[in-house]
Structures are given as structure tokens and as C-alpha cells.
């Protein structure tokens, strides 16, 4: 009898240990958790002006400033973690990051795997070409090589619209848009498709190299902040402070700092 009892106790202890290990596999942050635990924000740190490294190797940007103010109001420390943007959903689902906050388009496909904040900025995918290019229409891009970022809304659109993508000789995918623009400048590709805000900002820094066309790829979208499906509490708390920041003019001031005017969703 003692042997049976000991065996049962051993099995119970083993099950408890397994359950304990399983609960540690995913550590998600919640707004109501300990105030000393940082909220980890995943971003592409080569995505100016939303999030990027400055000359001092510090991560800065419009979204970074928004996140700093929001977490300050939540009385929580914040940690910005550079991630592979093409693996962003896995980073969020695993709990390695608590939030994706980096010019992320809200799409129906992404809603299947993430919770989103309310939209805070409008966006569209636009084609940029070399400054001396005569490309002005989609027809002129037929048989040309275009570049975009892996994991981007443009990539999703082209993957889901093969007839549209087939008109191009090749769609090259890059880890970040900076590499795509470098290839465009060096003549390795004919055009770059990117978020209009990001492309315009980059173009302003390289006015002698690139120009924006009127060619829009796909439908207009909105930027939103993404959270894990099971982290409704954090989503709601961040949304609450974002609403406060909009009402008191803080978001408008941050927009004016980075874009010269308030271009956020009213």
C-alpha cells in the first residue's frame, strides 16, 4: 500500500513540475502586473521615422516617443527590442515581446492572430523610383524589378494577389527598407514599394536620389498597436492612455516633432 501511495505522490509531483514549467514558457506582461517589470516593445529598428537608431545608437522615433509617454503614464518601465519584422507574430505569440509598436498596418489577416488598438494614423503603400526615372504609371512598371520589405503589408498584398504581382519581372524582398532604397539608388532594382510616410521621410533625407510616384499598391490602411490575443488587459490600458494623450494634445505634439504637423487620426 505504501508503495502505491508513494507512486501516486511521485506522479502528482511530476505533473505539478511539468505544469509549472509549461506556465513559464510564455511570460506576457499586463498593465496591472508589477510596476517594476518592463513592457517589452518589439520593433524594426531600421524603420525611420517610426523607430530607428540615431547617431548615438539610441532607438528613437515617432512610435518610440508615443510608447515612452504611454508607458510613463502607466507607471511602467519600457524596453525596446529590435526584432526580425518578418517574425513579428511569433515574437508576440511567444511572449518574447508584449507589444508590436512600429508603423504596423491593421489588416483582417493580422486580426486573426493579434489584438489591435484603435487606429492612430492612416497609411498607404506607394511606389518610389530614382529621381531621374520617367516611371509615372503602373503600366511602366511591367517587366520591372521592384523591392519591398519581408513581413510588410505590401508583401502580404502581393502574395495574395498573384495576378497583380505577375506583371513585375521580380519582387525582391529585403530585411528592411534601407537596404531596398540602397539597391534602388545603385540601380539593382527599378522601384521600391513602401509605406508612404516612411518613404517620404527617407526621400526627404535623400532628395537628390528618389521621388514619390502617384502609384498606390493595394488599399489604404491604418496603423495600430498590436498585442497578444490573450492580453486584453494590456491592450485596454494602453488604449486608455492613448485616448488621454489624444485628448490633451500630446499625440499632436509628438506628430509635429516628427512630421512638422499633426497627421494622426482625428
Predicted regions and their residues:
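Bacterial lipoprotein signal-peptidase II cleavage site
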Residues: 17-32
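Acidic, polar ligand-binding/catalytic clefts
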Residues: 68, 77-140, 211, 216-217
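Extended ligand-binding regions for polar small-molecule ligands
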Residues: 22, 64-73, 135, 140, ...
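A ligand-binding cleft/hinge motif common to bilobed small-molecule-binding domains
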Residues: 104-112, 159-162, 185-186, 190-219
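Extracytoplasmic small-molecule ligand-binding "clamshell" domains
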Residues: 31-103, 237, 248
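Short helix-initiation/N-cap motifs at beta->coil->alpha
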Residues: 79-90, 171-183
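Periplasmic-binding protein-like
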Residues: 45, 122-129, 200-243, 259-266
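Ligand-binding cleft/hinge of the Venus flytrap
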Residues: 53, 67-75, 154-174, 203-207
Amino acid at each position: 500500500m505504501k508503495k502505491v501511495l508513494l507512486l501516486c505522490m511521485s506522479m502528482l509531483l511530476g505533473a505539478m513540475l511539468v505544469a509549472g514549467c509549461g506556465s513559464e514558457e510564455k511570460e506576457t506582461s499586463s498593465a496591472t502586473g508589477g510596476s517594476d517589470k518592463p513592457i517589452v516593445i518589439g520593433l524594426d529598428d531600421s524603420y525611420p521615422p517610426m523607430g530607428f537608431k540615431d547617431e548615438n545608437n539610441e532607438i528613437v522615433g515617432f512610435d518610440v516617443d508615443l510608447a515612452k509617454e504611454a508607458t510613463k503614464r502607466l507607471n511602467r518601465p519600457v524596453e525596446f527590442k529590435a526584432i526580425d519584422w518578418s517574425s513579428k507574430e511569433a515574437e508576440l505569440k511567444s511572449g518574447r515581446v508584449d507589444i508590436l509598436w512600429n508603423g504596423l498596418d491593421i489588416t483582417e489577416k493580422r486580426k486573426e492572430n493579434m489584438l489591435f488598438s484603435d487606429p492612430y494614423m492612416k497609411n498607404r503603400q506607394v511606389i518610389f523610383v530614382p529621381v531621374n526615372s520617367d516611371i509615372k504609371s503602373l503600366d511602366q512598371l511591367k517587366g520591372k524589378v521592384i523591392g519591398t520589405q519581408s513581413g510588410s503589408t505590401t508583401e502580404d498584398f502581393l502574395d495574395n494577389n498573384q495576378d497583380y504581382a505577375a506583371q513585375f519581372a521580380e519582387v525582391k524582398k529585403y530585411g528592411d527598407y534601407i537596404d531596398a532604397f540602397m539597391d534602388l539608388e545603385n540601380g539593382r532594382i527599378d522601384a521600391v514599394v513602401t509605406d508612404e510616410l516612411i518613404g517620404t521621410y527617407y526621400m526627404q533625407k535623400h532628395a537628390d536620389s528618389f521621388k514619390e510616384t502617384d502609384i498606390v499598391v493595394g488599399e489604404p490602411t491604418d496603423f495600430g498597436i498590436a498585442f497578444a490575443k490573450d492580453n486584453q488587459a494590456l491592450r485596454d490600458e494602453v488604449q486608455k492612455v492613448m485616448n488621454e494623450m489624444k485628448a490633451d494634445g500630446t499625440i499632436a505634439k509628438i506628430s509635429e516633432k516628427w512630421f512638422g504637423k499633426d497627421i494622426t487620426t482625428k
